[in-house]
Amino acid sequence: MESADFYEVEPRPPMSSHLQSPPHAPSNAAFGFPRGAGPAPPPAPPAAPEPLGGICEHETSIDISAYIDPAAFNDEFLADLFQHSRQQEKAKAAAGPAGGGGDFDYPGAPAGPGGAVMSAGAHGPPPGYGCAAAGYLDGRLEPLYERVGAPALRPLVIKQEPREEDEAKQLALAGLFPYQPPPPPPPPHPHASPAHLAAPHLQFQIAHCGQTTMHLQPGHPTPPPTPVPSPHAAPALGAAGLPGPGSALKGLAGAHPDLRTGGGGGGSGAGAGKAKKSVDKNSNEYRVRRERNNIAVRKSRDKAKQRNVETQQKVLELTSDNDRLRKRVEQLSRELDTLRGIFRQLPESSLVKAMGNCA
């Protein structure tokens, strides 16, 4: 199905005939419009023939392969590119206050503070502006290829990616030493001596030295150590400022007087004491508990006996079925042997007749 907006067009006249400006008026069908769609425009005045080479005499080609495939070049090319652009920016900043028009001045423009501000209508566009722009771009791009490998460049710093072994070590250390928020600093103890507080501080540094050395860069200074809580508050508070097991046992013993805690406080390293129950056997609670336990034991035993009886009954049923099937197999085997003996005693002629009668 053809579209109603497109029509057949006439072939475009060659360039030579266009420059010679034929006297006939151009047809509207050449522009994709239907014939007779509008009034024919007046014929254009003949233009003087102009050579095609006069558009831009100093036309040069620019190699942009470096921007299309930068992987084919080394890192020095990119470093030189960035350094050259920074030098150009510095030169622009230095030449700006001096009164120059910057990179936007064209040749022949009046120099001065108002040179770049003056309108183009007063002076007219400069001749050969396209050629000047092409030469400007060539001058900007040529030093990029000339300065590659210059000895005056500073050494290029290449960022190294972390290896898999280092990442595995960091993950292992992060699992062994998980980050925990530091506890708030405790109030200074009036009777604590500096020598008494030195040992926990040293142990804290030793415990966290592996994690600190892995996460810090070589050039960064070591941060100050985290203040260590006082050893007097260790039984009450754990490593993360939470109540230790000793305080929980004490609170449980205070709530239930029938529970007694064994010796040993929480966080001492020797292990918390085992809690032992002392229940009075003459109390009603003990009797109710024993009765419930006995009932549960009886129920479980009754269920076990019932399952045993059901299993025995099923075994008996299966055994009887097996005997019945065995007897049936023996009977069928005897009948088969009898039939085989009968067919063996019959002559072949009778067998042929029997087969003919069946057919």
UniProtKB/Swiss-Prot annotation:
Compositionally biased residues, Gly residues: 261-272
**Tissue expr:** Isoform 2 and isoform 3 are expressed in adipose tissue and liver (at protein level).
| Region of interest (Interaction with FOXO1), ranges | 240-359
What positions are modified (N6-acetyllysine)? K159
Q: Which PROSITE patterns match?
A: BZIP
Q: Which residues carry this modification: Phosphothreonine?
A: T222, T226
Region called Required to functionally cooperate with SREBF1 in promoter activation, residue ranges:
180-194
Domain spans labelled bZIP: 283-346
Spell out the SMART domains in the cross-references: BRLZ (SM00338)
Cross-link for Glycyl lysine isopeptide (Lys-Gly) (interchain with G-Cter in SUMO), residue positions:
K159
What GO terms are given for molecular function? chromatin binding; chromatin DNA binding; DNA binding; DNA-binding transcription activator activity, RNA polymerase II-specific; DNA-binding transcription factor activity; DNA-binding transcription factor activity, RNA polymerase II-specific; DNA-binding transcription factor binding; histone deacetylase binding
Record PTM Phosphoserine, positions in chain: S193, S230
Write down the Pfam families for this protein, in alphabetical order. Answer: bZIP_2
Q: Where is this region: Required to induce adipocyte differentiation?
A: 126-200
- Compositional bias (Pro residues): 39-49, 179-191, 220-232
Q: Where is this region: Required to repress E2F1:TFDP1-mediated transcription, to inhibit cell cycle and to induce adipocyte differentiation?
A: 1-70
User: Any idea where this protein resides?
Assistant: Nucleus
Q: Where is this region: Leucine-zipper?
A: 318-346
Q: Which PANTHER family match?
A: CCAAT/ENHANCER BINDING PROTEIN (PTHR23334), CCAAT_ENHANCER-BINDING PROTEIN ALPHA (PTHR23334:SF5)
Q: What does this protein do?
A: Transcription factor that coordinates proliferation arrest and the differentiation of myeloid progenitors, adipocytes, hepatocytes, and cells of the lung and the placenta. Binds directly to the consensus DNA sequence 5'-T[TG]NNGNAA[TG]-3' acting as an activator on distinct target genes. During early embryogenesis, plays essential and redundant functions with CEBPB. Essential for the transition from common myeloid progenitors (CMP) to granulocyte/monocyte progenitors (GMP). Critical for the proper development of the liver and the lung.
State how it assembles.
Answer: Binds DNA as a homodimer and as a heterodimer. Can form stable heterodimers with CEBPB, CEBPD, CEBPE and CEBPG. Interacts with PRDM16. Interacts with UBN1. Interacts with ZNF638; this interaction increases transcriptional activation. Interacts with the complex TFDP2:E2F1; the interaction prevents CEBPA binding to target gene promoters and represses its transcriptional activity. Interacts with RB1. Interacts (when phosphorylated at Ser-193) with CDK2, CDK4, E2F4 and SMARCA2. Interacts with SREBPF1.
Q: What is this protein called?
A: CCAAT/enhancer-binding protein alpha
Per the UniProt record, the source organism is: Mus musculus
Name the gene for this chain: Cebpa
